A protein has these predicted regions:
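Phosphate/NTP-binding elements of NTP-utilizing enzymes
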Residues: 45
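Residue-level signal for well-ordered alpha-helical positions
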Residues: 16-17, 48, 88, 129-130
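Active-site neighborhoods of divalent-metal-dependent phosphate/nucleic-acid chemistry enzymes
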Residues: 57, 69-119
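General small-molecule cofactor/ligand-binding pocket signal
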Residues: 36, 75, 132-133
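Charged phosphate-binding loop/patch that engages nucleotide di/tri-phosphates or the phosphate backbone
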Residues: 111, 115-117, 121-134
Length: 134
């Protein structure tokens, strides 16, 4: 199975963080699965790293490097991914929670027919079958 990691899942995975569930660890470590991180996540890490509101010390360069060292493949953003975002049903998602990172990551997974691994309880509100909650 091809699996795209939500940004927080990728961060938890590369840091071996205790928030990463057993199910997530099993899916990520399964040799039959191919694991991807997105260029969008690199951008999200950059913004969070530079924001005084966050205490993320991980730089975007470190994030990308550690993901690659963990055996994850990078998924680049394409026009197809952006256009797929318009097919997401946002009607059940509160306006203040319509995170553009979430929408683009989910649309990437949908466009590529990948599963999307997340712990974000708002993601299932989009109703996409590709979502795996962990």
């Amino acid at each position: 199975m091809n699996i795209l990691l939500d940004t927080h899942i990728a961060i938890w995975a590369i840091a071996n963080h205790p928030n990463l569930s057993v199910k997530a660890r099993e899916l990520i470590s399964d040799p039959d699965n191919t694991i991807y991180f997105s260029a969008i996540s690199v951008w999200e890490v950059l913004l969070k790293h530079d924001s005084p509101k966050n205490n993320l010390t991980l730089t975007p360069e470190q994030f990308a490097e550690y993901c690659e060292e963990s055996g994850f493949y990078q998924l680049h953003l394409s026009t197809k991914h952006v256009l797929t975002a318009s097919s997401l049903d946002i009607s059940k998602v509160d306006k203040e929670h319509r995170d553009p990172f979430d929408r683009l990551l989910l649309s990437q997974a949908k466009a590529e027919n990948y599963s999307f691994l997340t712990h974000d309880t708002r993601i299932p509100l989009y109703g996409e079958k590709c979502t795996i909650m962990v």
